[in-house]
Amino acid sequence: MTPEPPAPDTASRDAENLDAAAAQQRLRKLHSKATRLKLDLHDLAEDLPIGWEGLLDVARRTYDAYAEIALLEGLAEKETSR
């Protein structure tokens, strides 16, 4: 059994209403944010057990950023295949 994806946040729900240019701009910002979060998660993991309390929060935000990237890229792919 695969886990259910998290409920989409407001940005994810609004992603379907973006035009192509706005979606590309959003994707660029999300890629930057996701990369920063990935590095934060890596740094936090290196310092374990110090700072373990923040691990789940950073992991969730990283997951959410990459989930939204996947959503936007999937929508962009649908648009180009029409």
From Swiss-Prot:
Entry coiled-coil feature ranges? none
Instruction: Enumerate the InterPro entries for this protein.
Output: Helix_hairpin_bin_sf (IPR029012), Put_N_fixation (IPR007774)
One GO term under biological process is:
nitrogen fixation
Kindly give the Gene3D superfamilies that the UniProt entry links to this protein: Helix hairpin bin
Alphabetical UniProt keywords = Nitrogen fixation
One Pfam family in the UniProt entry: Rop-like
What domain of life? Bacteria
Claim: Nuclease is one of the keywords in the record: no
Translocase listed as a keyword: no
State the family it belongs to.
Belongs to the UPF0437 family.
**Name by which UniProt lists this protein:** UPF0437 protein in nifX-nifW intergenic region
Organism of provenance: Frankia alni
